[in-house]
Structures are given as structure tokens and as C-alpha cells.
Curated annotation (Swiss-Prot):
This is Pyridoxal 5'-phosphate synthase subunit PdxT. CDD domains: GATase1_PB. InterPro entries: Class_I_gatase-like, PdxT/SNO, PdxT/SNO_CS. In the presence of PdxS, forms a dodecamer of heterodimers. Only shows activity in the heterodimer. PROSITE patterns: PDXT_SNO_1 (PS01236), PDXT_SNO_2 (PS51130). Pfam families: SNO. Catalyzes the hydrolysis of glutamine to glutamate and ammonia as part of the biosynthesis of pyridoxal 5'-phosphate. The resulting ammonia molecule is channeled to the active site of PdxS. Keywords: Glutamine amidotransferase, Hydrolase, Lyase, Pyridoxal phosphate. L-glutamine binds at residues 47-49, 105, 139-140. Belongs to the glutaminase PdxT/SNO family. Pathway: Cofactor biosynthesis; pyridoxal 5'-phosphate biosynthesis. Coiled coil: none annotated. The gene is pdxT.
Length: 192
């Protein structure tokens, strides 16, 4: 069984653990650098990106997670997507810069503007997983404002990319872990 880490300093890491189990993987809740040696891939969960950055620095994990991402698969959702982006606006902030995208934080609005939407994935996603719409939970979600060459869009919402991949990296601006649909997590497992 594949072991996948979920950064567990803040955010919805428990929901990702359950989603990984549904997808057939063993979650490892990463709170210490030594745990990075036990996993094949890492999920950066949703939560609050500035808080995660502070905790990564406080726990002295930032550089270790960055190093992990230089050689291993990483999947970021919502705040995790922000942490993976090369560019962050509204406001600008530090990130791991793993994926050639620029994101705007909280671009769908405030907490009260959060929503659940049905998203039609592109054929490339469906061909590699299964057909059907994705239930996308957007909670103060970022919008991907720019993508560079080599980034593949797998699903969009209102014309904006919401699920992308670049090589071993997967990014969702929504929360697939908050639904019973394990296809996005299964796609990540295929990168391990």
C-alpha cells in the first residue's frame, strides 16, 4: 500500500487522510521532518496559507518540504495550491514555487461566498480516472490567474482552471477531500 503524507500542521488534513484511505493509500500525518522519509508523495491541504507558512517556519519544516517537492510528487488543495504556486497575489506571499502558475488568494470572495459547484472535468482527467462531473467545494478559494507552458488544465469552473497538473504535481483550488469522490486523490496516487 502506498504511503502518502498529509502536512498536518493546520487545515483539513484529517479529511485528506480519509480520502486517501478511500483511494487505497495509507495516510501519514506529517508533523516532523523525519516523516518525510517514510512517504512517497505529500499533500498540502486546504486551510489558511499564511498560518501554514508561519507553522512551517516555526516547526522548521519549510526547507524540508521544499526539498521533498524538488524530487517527489506533491498535491496541493486550496491553501496548498497557494503554497505550490510560483506566484501569489492578493497579497503577495512566500510559497514553495513548485508549479508554474500564479494564484490570487481568496479570489472567489469571503467565507460567506463559499460554494459547492458541479465541475465538468476535461477528457484527459476522465480518461485517466472515470467519467462524470466533480463536486467542487470552494472555501475562500484561490483562482489560478496564469499558467505557464507545461501546465495541463484538467478541469475549469467559470472559465478559470481549478484542477491542474505539471509533471509530478497536482493542484486543486477546491477541496476534493470533502466529497466521497476519490478520483482526484486516485489521480495523485498514479503519480507515485
Amino acid at each position: 500500500m502506498k504511503k502518502v503524507g498529509v502536512l498536518s500542521l493546520q487545515g483539513d488534513f484529517a479529511a485528506h487522510g480519509a480520502a486517501l484511505e478511500r483511494a487505497g493509500a495509507q495516510p501519514v500525518f506529517v508533523r516532523e521532518r523525519e516523516q518525510l522519509n517514510q512517504i512517497e508523495g505529500l499533500i498540502l491541504p486546504g486551510g489558511e496559507s499564511t498560518t501554514m507558512l508561519k507553522l512551517l517556519r516555526y516547526e522548521d519544516l519549510f526547507d524540508d518540504v521544499a526539498e521533498f517537492g524538488r524530487t517527489k510528487p506533491v498535491f496541493g488543495t486550496c491553501a496548498g495550491a497557494i503554497l505550490m504556486a510560483k506566484g501569489v497575489t492578493n497579497p503577495a506571499q512566500e510559497s514553495f514555487g513548485l508549479v508554474d502558475i500564479e494564484v490570487e488568494r481568496n479570489a472567489y470572495g469571503r467565507q460567506t461566498d463559499s460554494r459547492i459547484a458541479q465541475v465538468r472535468p476535461f477528457p484527459d482527467f476522465e480518461n485517466r480516472t472515470a467519467p462524470g462531473e466533480l463536486k467542487a467545494v470552494f472555501i475562500r478559494a484561490p483562482i489560478i490567474r496564469r499558467i505557464e507552458d507545461g501546465v495541463r488544465v484538467l478541469a475549469s469552473y467559470q472559465g478559470d482552471p481549478v484542477l491542474i497538473e505539471q509533471g509530478r504535481f497536482l493542484v486543486a483550488t477546491f477541496h476534493p477531500e470533502l466529497t466521497d469522490d476519490a478520483r482526484v486523490h486516485s489521480l495523485f496516487l498514479s503519480k507515485l
